[in-house]
């Protein structure tokens, strides 16, 4: 039994049939970190470690219905938003988020502005980027773009960590949200992420690069971990630090599955089975 209320995280994202990213990665991450995961699915994808092969969008009205069903019964302490697809989906989600945050102003909203799958398939229509900027991003507390996504959102090129700092500050000013700009696309032995919080304080997080092709779902996992830590009361800079560590360990313990970009291992914080669960069953006469 839980001794205190469990943090509730609603993930609004696409379903990954391979289980490495999207809703599946979100559920694994949130559960591993001790929170409760609920979902609103925006699209079904036919994918594996070799790439995304097909996408079936969920009708916007049905996405809204999923969100309302969760919020009106289970509730949420944080909402993580991932794959969106098209403008009508963005507008539908934004409409629901406005209603939810008006009733619950302390709700954390973390948006991972997913645009491309690792294989290069578009997960957000180019013509929808303007809608994303105008309708949804201003509703976020934290936005977690990688470098290509930040370039699309800002219209500027990023080639250095100094560029990252400038663009993160620019995106903060244009959205009002804290920006965690992920630097994994820059070359080098170190990976640097930049955080600009809502007080315009700048933080730099650096760690040695892990040489691995088992990195499918890192963005989804990071955003879900961040949303979970925030819902659990961790302050933003510390939540970023903890979320980055969780993703790093999930990469290091990747199960080596698939012939392409393999999934992470999310079950890091699950304790080993209790002794009575590993004993053989009692044989009854």
Locate predicted features.
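Conserved N-terminal subdomain of the carbohydrate kinase-like
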Residues: 2-11, 31-111, 115-118
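Short, small-residue alpha-helix embedded
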Residues: 151-152, 212-236
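Phosphate-handling active-site elements
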Residues: 34-38, 201-203, 229-243
